Amino acid sequence: AGKVFGLEIAVYMVKISYEQKPYRRSLMQTWGAQVIASPSMSTKSGRKVLTERPYYKGSLGTAISEAIELAMQTPKCKYTLGSVLNHVALHQTIIGLESEKQMEMAGEYPDIVIGCIGGGSNFSGISFPFLRHVIKGDKKTRFIAAEPASCPKLTRGTFKFDFGDEAGYTPLIPMYTLGHNFTPAHIHAGGLRYHGAGSIVSQLKKDNLIEAVAIPQLETFEAGVLFAQTEGIIP
C-alpha cells in the first residue's frame, strides 16, 4: 500500500518473528519498506529494553512503542497499527464475512467459532460477523478465543485501563491486561506475545459473550500435526 501511494514505510517487526519468518520481511523489503527488528537501538524505548534485557526477542507492546516514538519525532510521519484497536478489528471482519458466505454456500452454519488472540485482530476478524447474530438473538454460536498459556491476558488478566504499549505512549485503553510491562516468554507465535486484548474483545469477554482458553505451545504443535495428518492441511 505504501508503494502504491508513494509513501516511505518503516515497519517495526517483533524480533522473534523477524528472525523466524524471513519471507515476510523479504516481501516488505521487496516493496521498498524499511523493516526493523524490535527491540532496536534506533529508539529510546528500544534501547531501554535492550539495556535491561539484552537477549529479549521483543513483543507487540515494544514494537508499538518504537513505532510511536519514530512517528512523534519525525516530521510528517504518521503511525498506524495492525491490531488491538477498534478500526483494525472492523477492517479484519472481511475474514468473517467471507467465512459466513462460504458456510452459506455449503448450507451450513458454525456451532463454534475459534480464533487465536494476541491483540485481537485475528479473533475479531473471524468472530464478529457471526457474533452479531448471537447479539440479535438469531443464533446460539459459541466463540472461543485461544491465547498462549504464556501470555494469558483473557484467562488470568485484569480488566482495567492500561497502556497499549510497553513505554506508555498510547492513550489508556479499557482491556483485559497482564500489565503493559509484562514480559512474555519467547514462544514461536511472535504476534501473540501481547500483554492485553483489544477493548471490544475485552468487553465481550467481560459480558460473557465469548469464552477464552489458554493453551501451552507444545499442545498447539501436537494439534497442528494431528490436523495436518488427518485433514491434509498444514494449519
Spell out what each predicted region is:
Residues 101-108:
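Phosphate/pyrophosphate-binding loops at sites that engage ATP/ADP/AMP, CoA/4′-phosphopantetheine
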Residues 1-57, 153-163:
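Active-site-proximal loop->helix
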Residues 12-14, 38, 82, 115-117, ...:
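Generic beta-strand/beta-sheet core signal
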